[in-house]
């Protein structure tokens, strides 16, 4: 069984008297920094001097400094920067200030697990990862609740790494819901697999394949959009609220029968074998190497595919139909 930690297992005293640098002020950065501050902890946000978010963080009542200045001040450094720039920023702006006994932490294990960042042996290294987007982390904290999270220790120099990590998790509200103990390897590899095979890559290709199949067969693109993309939210919401069983209970018997009989023809053994291959390429570092190499040459393949995907007919049809949906945020 996975070990789960709650409020009673965590003590904010392990962070009292320590300065916490939160590097980045995006989705997770703003939520974590504000919640830590509201938990009575000493926080500084680290940003580029020319960052558009500098004034936003100041307006939110937070101390802001450049990344090197924030790291120089802090005993705990939380790196909430995009995966592809963390290695460079670490080498240039974090490592010079990572003195003995400090703590280096992350909310995703990519750069530690794949060796893009190799911290000195005389610091703590751990991970605290809320399992929700930043706006929900912040909202739940403000309501006196929390979202589930993960905690992992990569390096325990001081003997207090897990205590500090759990204190941080408590400071952002996660221990109210429960914090699951994991490892950098498990967090990183499962996160990447979920994104690639299911949540992003898998779902995107399934939607487009369904849309294309209907349009190629002569059906109206608008009908194809409704059936293969728009209604997905209705199904996902049911799954999110109560699992696959809730969804199957809520749909018609015809839909449920089609689920059981046809689903395995779409995701068949060939698909499952390809998923196993995708996982192997994550585990052996192939994906990480490809992504790092892509960034080193300014992402030509990434940018070309991104542009091509933006020009898929489903985007034009969807833009028109969403104009007819006043409940959607523009």
Swiss-Prot record:
Domain KARI N-terminal Rossmann residue range list: 2-182
Positions annotated to bind Mg(2+) 2: 191, 227, 231
Binding site for NADP(+): 25-28, 48, 51, 83-86, 134
Pfam families: KARI_C, KARI_N
GO MF terms held by the record: ketol-acid reductoisomerase activity; magnesium ion binding; NADP binding
Top-rank taxon: Bacteria
Cofactor list: Mg(2+)
Cofactor binding note of this UniProt entry: Binds 2 magnesium ions per subunit.
GO cellular component terms attached to this protein's record: cytosol
Classification via InterPro entries: 6-PGluconate_DH-like_C_sf, KARI, KARI_C, KARI_N, KARI_prok, NAD(P)-bd_dom_sf
Keyword Cytoplasm appears in the UniProt entry: no
Residue numbers annotated as active site: 108
UniProt-listed Enzyme Commission number(s): 1.1.1.86
Residues involved in substrate binding: 252
Catalytic activity of the protein: (2R)-2,3-dihydroxy-3-methylbutanoate + NADP(+) = (2S)-2-acetolactate + NADPH + H(+); (2R,3R)-2,3-dihydroxy-3-methylpentanoate + NADP(+) = (S)-2-ethyl-2-hydroxy-3-oxobutanoate + NADPH + H(+)
Annotated pathway: Amino-acid biosynthesis; L-isoleucine biosynthesis; L-isoleucine from 2-oxobutanoate: step 2/4; Amino-acid biosynthesis; L-valine biosynthesis; L-valine from pyruvate: step 2/4
Residues where Mg(2+) 1 binds: 191, 195
SUPFAM superfamilies: 6-phosphogluconate dehydrogenase C-terminal domain-like (SSF48179), NAD(P)-binding Rossmann-fold domains (SSF51735)
Family according to the record: Belongs to the ketol-acid reductoisomerase family.
Record protein name field: Ketol-acid reductoisomerase (NADP(+))
